């Protein structure tokens, strides 16, 4: 079976920035890929925290040029929240795939076994993250849109304009 593809339609400062299409590695990380896929479609409804289990309307709260764009905190919006479709947090599935370069999609965490809904898209090779963060997909179209998002980031991670997932889903 082919790996699923999902999309984000991003806005930057309220203006449409374009579509990012990602392939999810369901073949190597089925549980992690399924979590992200379902959070793109919103099909699981409302989570334990009372918020929709959906990336739609959430922001990239941390964008560091030359490193990565991080998002997925749809409960708090600032990097302290998020929730998986499995409940609060889930374990690191495996570290088969590596942080080989721009476009790699990986889970953000707060240490081993703390995966929720936060993720990041690499804008560079980040091999020091291998064995610490689960790589579960890659950007297949729209890396130019990620570059636009990267351009409003800063070394602190704060964005000069909000980068919002205006719409998302499965293709």
From Swiss-Prot:
UniProt GO molecular function: cyclosporin A binding; peptidyl-prolyl cis-trans isomerase activity
Keywords, ordered alphabetically: Cytoplasm, Isomerase, Rotamase
Keyword Cytoplasm: yes
PPIase cyclophilin-type domain boundaries: 7-170
Activity regulation text: Binds cyclosporin A (CsA). CsA mediates some of its effects via an inhibitory action on PPIase.
One CC-aspect GO term: cytoplasm
Coiled-coil positions: none
InterPro entries to which the protein is assigned, alphabetical: Cyclophilin-like_dom_sf (IPR029000), Cyclophilin-type_PPIase (IPR024936), Cyclophilin-type_PPIase_CS (IPR020892), Cyclophilin-type_PPIase_dom (IPR002130)
Biological processes per GO annotation: protein folding
Protein name (record): Peptidyl-prolyl cis-trans isomerase
